[in-house]
């Protein structure tokens, strides 16, 4: 079976209602701007529909089409560590949440970052924290695997070798990912 780049939804993503009203249609658009690097896979270059619909039941505004997550994230190019503003924000966040978690637990602290990107957030945690990151993009290849346990996968896990990984964490973060759900 050939995997398609996108598919049309016929019911609300939240409540399942089938009455979806078109509110804006921007026709077909390129997914995102990408930097094409030498010896790297080319980004997806075909246009996909960009249409917003409104659920008549719960009023959720949502995309009419769902794009394949492989197309969206396998060749993702943005790295958190290259942006000073982002690094500063992530460091402040880690400082804040570390103080909170250290009041409850002083040792063996285990943290998970979903959508860990290049590991910038995880690198700000103290050395004695056990760090885990999940991200489907190739960017995780830059992370020092001696300092951070990395899963190059989607969350929840898609790869069979990761599906049996069961662990409780003291803290779970997920930055700049929820708008993709």
Question: Where are each of the predicted segments found?
Answer:
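N-terminal juxtadomain amphipathic helix
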Residues: 1-85
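Conserved alpha-helix/loop element of class I SAM-dependent methyltransferases that forms part
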Residues: 85-107
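Conserved SAM/SAH-binding beta-strand->alpha-helix loop
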Residues: 137-139
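Conserved SAM-binding strand-loop segment of SAM-dependent methyltransferases
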Residues: 146-160
